[in-house]
């Protein structure tokens, strides 16, 4: 108990530092004149090229094999489970934004899909309680925190200062990680979190497997296209709007889980 209390206090301090830092940097950034909000474009493009090279060399072939080998019903179950595991974050964001109707619906989904669907079948969605995604970045936007400059993060892809800080805070305070951290030993928890991270990346990549290649083929400036689509997508999500026929944003995303963040750098920096 003492250990958990100590970690909780340290985690709270880290969360405060992250969010205050994001707010400060976002406010100091100012508004760009060209509307792209990309003052770090030169560095961003270099990171983008590296990310795409990693995608083509590693993530895309793995995802293609996953799609080719794993039957659709199994992939649907994996997708449902990963979505289900993120719904506690959605619930917290719903509450932080004062969206009580959506919070109630998310609560019903968590309970119903856990008890009846075992997390792998969206029985509540079939009953009319459709799922939605919310995150801390959206809550900060509703609170008036500006997005700050556009960023391309190594491995993680398109982001900005506000959303990047929010994603880091979420990784430190993911409710599912809290449960596994409490009931599993460190090694088991690390492998469970790692598996979740890997399958999340593969599942997200599978959603845009053909679309990303087509988008790259038809874009005069692939980097600028992704930047524009990302910013449109985030603005739409903050408004709780529908994306309509917009092309989904290709993601090369590895969600950071706390056990992975706490692993010594010497052990995690090498691929």
Task: Locate each region found by the language model.
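Post-signal peptide N-terminal segment of mature Sec-exported envelope proteins
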Residues: 35-61, 65, 83
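Mid-length scaffold segments of soluble, non-membrane domains
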Residues: 84-162
């Amino acid at each position: 108990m003492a250990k958990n209390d100590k970690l909780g206090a340290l985690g709270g301090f880290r969360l405060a530092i992250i969010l205050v830092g994001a707010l400060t940097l976002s406010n100091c950034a100012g508004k760009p004149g060209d509307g792209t909000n990309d003052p770090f474009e030169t560095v961003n493009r270099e990171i983008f090229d590296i990310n795409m090279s990693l995608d083509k060399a590693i993530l895309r072939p793995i995802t293609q094999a996953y799609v080719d080998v794993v039957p659709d019903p199994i992939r649907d179950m994996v997708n449902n489970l990963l979505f289900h595991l993120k719904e506690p974050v959605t619930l917290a964001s719903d509450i932080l934004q004062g969206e009580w109707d959506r919070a109630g619906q998310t609560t019903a989904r968590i309970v119903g899909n856990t008890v009846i669907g075992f997390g792998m079948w969206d029985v509540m969605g079939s009953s009319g309680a459709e799922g939605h995604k919310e995150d801390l970045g959206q809550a900060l936007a509703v609170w008036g925190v500006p997005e700050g400059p556009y960023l391309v993060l190594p491995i993680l892809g398109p982001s900005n200062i506000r959303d990047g800080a929010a994603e880091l805070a979420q990784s430190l305070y993911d409710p599912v990680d809290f449960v596994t951290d409490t009931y599993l030993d460190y090694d088991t928890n690390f492998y469970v979190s790692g598996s979740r991270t890997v399958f999340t990346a593969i599942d997200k990549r599978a959603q845009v497997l053909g679309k990303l290649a087509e988008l790259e083929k038809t874009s005069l400036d692939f980097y600028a296209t992704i930047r524009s689509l990302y910013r449109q997508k985030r603005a739409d999500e903050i408004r709780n709007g529908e994306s309509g026929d917009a092309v989904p944003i290709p993601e090369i995303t590895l969600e950071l889980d706390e056990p992975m963040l706490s692993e010594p750098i010497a052990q995690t920096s090498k691929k």
